[in-house]
Amino acid sequence: MLASPTASLHAADKPEQAQAPEPAAEKRVITSHVLTTAKGAKLPYTATAGTLLLKDKQGKPGASLFYVAYTVAPKAGERRPVTFFYNGGPGSSSIWLHMASFAPVRVPVDVEAQGREGGGRMPRLASNPDSLLDTTDMVFLDAVGTGYSRALDPQGGKLYWGNDQDAAAFTQAIRRYVEINNRWLSPKYLFGESYGTTRSAMVSYKLIDSGMPVDGVILMSSILNFAQRAPGLDRMDINYLPSYAATAWYHGKVGRGTGLETHVARARQFAQGPYAAALAKGQDIGAQERESVIAQMASLTGLSSDYLRQADLHVSPDRFRKELLRDRGAVTGGFDTRFTGSEGDNAADTAQSDPADDAISGAIIANFSAYLAHDLGYAPDGDYVVNTPTLFPVWDWSHMPPGGPRQNAMANVAIDLGAAMRRAPQMRVLSLSGYYDLSTPFFATEFDLAHLYLPSALRSKLISRYYASGHMLYLDGETFNEVTRDVRAFISAKPN
């Protein structure tokens, strides 16, 4: 999940500042539990809440990284996989994946009930019979400055707040976990959501480059190329359009009698064809072609021809979310455009809030606080920081790609992912995308994954799956079941 200023248990008002170093010791609190799986089997497991010590370039303690691991004792001769999970932001803890997806406990958020204004009671944490624990051990990691992860260096978190810095920290943390738990021979998977996919692309290459094999990378709601978002470029307009079309279809604005995937397929063709050609011509486009594109765009997105004419074919996500349902006095969500809400100013140009985020944050945060204390018995040293949204202004967005001659001002980590796959041909990639996600539109992911520059023999290692859901694919029952099935099959598959 991208960092949200509303999602906070003990929100940080500003990035973590320099502080006196704490004792450089790793903590571990271990508890035993039993999960009843969907098949009725009893699965004993261990939950470990603890910290991993990260060292700086001088070998001194630099940060303490918090994690929660769920492990099952292997059978004789078994090498159980281990999967490392993290959310994104940058500046988000792993609370969302941890509490709402594949762990042995889950907050069953009801998207439909929570999405209606005033609808839905707060769900309670419960055992998760569909947990992936029967398939893989799981480790949920919090980035430095989030969760209970803290900087120990006198410079505070500045050493960790950047693309390359963050990737180096997670690489070190994963290696440290593998070392202290003797998981060298275990199949290893990375599971990142949102900016976590950015992290996974970089970390996969760094781990492989350091001699640690990575068997698979799972990308949920990807953002791999920040350079596409630079002002003046048309690529993101093209990338958003199929998601606009899916949203308009869901809310009954277009596509009567047409299925979602058929409507989205038409939007893909239009976006990559006539729409891309029109944007490339800029002000040189002819009047007849312009009107033809406007008419097609209106039929796909549900926006009026007059509005598209005034917008000159360029519609930002916040403008779209406000305009689509303006006649109903409603605004759609951004993380999940199926959600709707109301705002005080219906005449505003852009959406000022995100109903999708507002609907889910409270339930997950409240349950997590109780779970840590009562079930895991973890006594923290301070507050759990769910999100640190103010990391954005101080984040170092530059990136040195593998073999690159210079630092790029804006990261394109598709380069890293492609390099990792070429370097380690056994590594597979599973991409998971939601049609109703305007935070990381699926068409942008398609573009990036089509530019990994893989030899034909490796193309089969790249698998893409799509769902009628938003950014956080695990937040409604039907999609959660589909995603769980696909991830379980991916991890369980035998290497070829």
Regions found by a protein language model. Give the residues of each.
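N-terminal cap/lid subdomain of alpha/beta-hydrolase-fold enzymes
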Residues: 12-17, 59-159
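A catalytic-pocket lid/entrance helix-loop region that shapes and gates access to the active site
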Residues: 104-108, 206-302
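Alpha/beta-hydrolase active-site loop
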Residues: 133, 143, 160-178
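Alpha/beta-hydrolase fold nucleophile elbow
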Residues: 183-194
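Glycine-rich nucleophile elbow surrounding the catalytic serine of serine-hydrolase chemistry
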Residues: 192-205
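Alpha/beta-hydrolase fold catalytic core
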Residues: 284-439
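Active-site-adjacent alpha-helix of alpha/beta-hydrolase-fold enzymes
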Residues: 438-461
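Catalytic histidine-centered segment of alpha/beta-hydrolase-like enzymes
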Residues: 468-479
